[in-house]
Swiss-Prot record:
SUBUNIT field: Heterodimer with aos-1.
Pfam families, per database record: ThiF (PF00899), UAE_UbL (PF14732)
Residues annotated as binding Zn(2+): 154, 157, 431, 434
InterPro entries assigned: ThiF/MoeB/HesA, ThiF_NAD_FAD-bd, UAE_UbL_dom, Ub-E1_IAD_1, Ub_act_enz_dom_a_sf, Uba2, Ubiquitin-activating_enz, UBQ-activ_enz_E1_Cys_AS
Species this protein is from: Caenorhabditis elegans
Compositional bias segments (type: Acidic residues): 204-214
Family recorded in the similarity comment: Belongs to the ubiquitin-activating E1 family.
Enzyme class, UniProt record, top EC level: transferase
Keywords: ATP-binding, Metal-binding, Nucleotide-binding, Transferase, Ubl conjugation pathway, Zinc
PANTHER family referenced in this protein's UniProt entry, alphabetically: SUMO-ACTIVATING ENZYME SUBUNIT 2, UBIQUITIN-ACTIVATING ENZYME E1
Entry function: The dimeric enzyme acts as an E1 ligase for smo-1. It mediates ATP-dependent activation of smo-1 and formation of a thioester with a conserved cysteine residue on uba-2.
Biased composition (Basic and acidic residues): 219-231, 531-570
Record protein name field: SUMO-activating enzyme subunit uba-2
Amino acid sequence: MPSWREKHEKIVQSKILVIGAGGIGCELLKNLAVTGFRKVHVIDLDTIDISNLNRQFLFRKEHVSSSKAATATQVVKQFCPQIELTFDHDSIFEKKYNMEFFQAYDIVLNALDNRAARNYVNRMCHAANRPLIDSGSGGYFGQVSVIMRGKTECYECVDKPVQQTTYPGCTIRNTPSEHIHCTVWAKHVFNQLFGEVDIDDDVSPDMDAVDPDNTEAVTTEKEKEAMKEEPAPVGTRQWAESVDYDAAKVFDKLFLHDIEYLCKMEHLWKQRKRPSPLEFHTASSTGGEPQSLCDAQRDDTSIWTLSTCAKVFSTCIQELLEQIRAEPDVKLAFDKDHAIIMSFVAACANIRAKIFGIPMKSQFDIKAMAGNIIPAIASTNAIVAGIIVTEAVRVIEGSTVICNSSIATTQSNPRGRIFGGDATNPPNPRCFVCSEKREVFIYVNPDTMTVGGLCEKVLKQKLNMLAPDVMDSATSRIIVSSDGDTDDLLPKKLAEVSIEDGAILSCDDFQQEMEIKLFIKKGDRLAGDDFEVARSEKEPEPDDRKRKADGSEEPEAKRQKVEEKDDKNGNEAVAEITETMA
């Protein structure tokens, strides 16, 4: 059994690669330094935002807009000058971060906030045969997973379900049933009043929309005739300008007149509760004395009263109007970290929720939904980072006691603990990343799917390849080239390039050192670039693994998209737990 000196020497000599210098990354770098690790390299593409300062404790106000990796390196060296800490302000997807790069390190520690980057690091560590410790946190929950080639399941052995991020436009405008519907609508209201107007983000009632819960229900001719007697709803921006953005009148337009108009669509309310129109003066006197905007913003974890929501709505309109008039050529854009904008959206969402009988939420919760993120909690990040280092020490020492940890800091388990460990699972024999038999069966319609659709939708989006090269195994013909030599084939249907039922495609991604055999199975019921993925030849996976091409939606089912912040902001709102760095 090695002595503590021998163990310490292993820690000192080990070369550690840290990917991510955000919420978990800051805590992790500090922990590595004080534990005794001396050879550490950190990579992060992000820069410091003022909203990071409440939980990413290596950063200060003067660091805003600076590189996270560079600043974290500088600060850690100040309190631990003996550490050999280097950094790259770069994207992990750059070609220089190849298998040889990863092989230069003894262990890789993930503090990433998005699935694409985690997939890439997982594959590179597998190719380089380097241990990977993956981590994530979301609110009061967190997880740490140890991944070792041939011993444990990899990051992609289990499919990660994605939370819905699109909602039917008719649900948003006519029949919200969840607070997220009200939050999306409130963001649209902000854009209609102060931002870039998108005709797809109209907030007025949609008279011709079909009830999503009762597809047979339509607006009857009698209802249409009755509604014709009423003036049709006008555009939100047009209405606001006509009344000089009078807060009470804008309120009544959105929450009284539009709701009264909506109530005339009798077919919508046969199986659901009718909304209750709300007047500004009524709202202002409901729920006691309203809080001021400043007090309400400080109290962002409590649920505002209706009178406070009306007060915040009115105050924010005046504040935002002043900003617009000060810079008339500048259109405001939704920003979850802009205090006035976020308070306006929160007030709007809660007022609409009240009208439709939906429980109201705190601004903290609404911000999470509006930003399409899970808020980061500093204490959760600290616990996760501590567990990462504990597991890293075990791996370096060659310990056989390796486990995956889950954390819930809101309540303890029956043993009085806030986190627990689970035994690691063996590799999934059907995983196309870490199994010896890297095979994927897909169901497509060769008569409708294009070569470009196969490359973009299947290989890049579903299988997360970066620059695939595809060859027909039967004829050795290259149908997709990462160099662009076959771009003329991209518009062609698979059948036109002799890719039919039973075809086997050899797909190589040299950047990730990855090769997959893709078996083509014909699915006559599929259209366009639709496809289904199966892990085996016997049967396709469940329907929830189906991925449709973006343009294949029927017009009447057109969906209004929640703002999808890119991975830079840590906004992959998914059922798996991911860290929020931004």
